[in-house]
């Protein structure tokens, strides 16, 4: 039987660009795992992508995944834009290079191992698991830049 995993992700950035963090909560049966990390110089979109990447890469075998994100950038990118980008050799419709293509390629590879149901959740709307993912992203931001309070 294929394992079922529920994931909540979020990214945070102090300045854009600036120090940033990502966080994710993974649920598998009655088990819960929280992860976070950060980078000293990044963007909010890169941190949103990293949260999903890190969570999916943590899974050591193919799973049925329900992944929740409050990022329209991640949702539209993975569900709509990525097919065109790949078909055009990682160029946008106007022939510009895709921003963050290194992370989009990594996310594409990470999701290929799993059956992922992408779910959008409204950010900062009081959803407890999204709020926890946000807190983890902010913890990752603090780890990347201890001077950020």
Curated annotation (Swiss-Prot):
What cofactors does this protein use? Mg(2+)
The principal location of this protein is cytoplasm
Location relative to the cell: Cytoplasm
- Which terms does the record give in the GO molecular function aspect? magnesium ion binding; nucleic acid binding; RNA-DNA hybrid ribonuclease activity
Reactions the enzyme catalyzes? Endonucleolytic cleavage to 5'-phosphomonoester
Domain RNase H type-1: start-end pairs = 1-142
Superkingdom in the source lineage: Bacteria
Which enzyme type, at the first EC level? Answer: hydrolase
Entry-linked Gene3D superfamilies? Ribonuclease H-like superfamily/Ribonuclease H
A Gene Ontology biological process in which this protein takes part is: DNA replication, removal of RNA primer
Q: GO cellular component annotations, sorted alphabetically?
A: cytoplasm
Q: Keyword annotations for this protein?
A: Cytoplasm, Endonuclease, Hydrolase, Magnesium, Metal-binding, Nuclease
The cofactor note reads: Binds 1 Mg(2+) ion per subunit. May bind a second metal ion at a regulatory site, or after substrate binding.
| List of residues binding Mg(2+) 2 | 10, 134
- Annotated Mg(2+) 1 binding lies at 10, 48, 70
Q: What is its EC number?
A: 3.1.26.4
Question: What InterPro entries does the record point to?
Answer: RNase_H, RNaseH-like_sf, RNaseH_domain, RNaseH_sf, RNaseHI
Q: Which Pfam family, just one, is annotated for this protein?
A: RNase_H
Purpose of the protein: Endonuclease that specifically degrades the RNA of RNA-DNA hybrids.
- Identify the HAMAP family for this entry: RNase_H
Q: Which family does it belong to?
A: Belongs to the RNase H family.
Assembly? Monomer.
List the protein's name.
Ribonuclease H
């Amino acid at each position: 039987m294929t394992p079922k995993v529920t994931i909540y992700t979020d990214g945070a950035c102090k300045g854009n660009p600036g120090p940033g963090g990502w966080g994710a909560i993974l649920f598998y049966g009655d088990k819960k795992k929280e992860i976070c990390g950060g980078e000293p110089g990044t963007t909010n979109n890169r941190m949103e992508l990293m949260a999903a990447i890190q969570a999916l890469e943590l899974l050591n075998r193919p799973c049925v995944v329900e992944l929740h994100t409050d990022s329209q950038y991640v949702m539209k990118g993975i569900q709509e834009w990525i097919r065109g980008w790949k078909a055009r050799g990682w160029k946008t419709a106007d022939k510009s290079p895709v921003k963050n293509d290194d992370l989009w390629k990594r996310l594409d590879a990470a999701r290929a191992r799993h059956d992922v149901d992408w779910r959008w959740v409204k950010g900062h709307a009081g959803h407890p698991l999204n709020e926890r993912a946000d807190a983890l992203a902010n913890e990752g931001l603090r780890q990347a830049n201890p001077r950020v309070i």
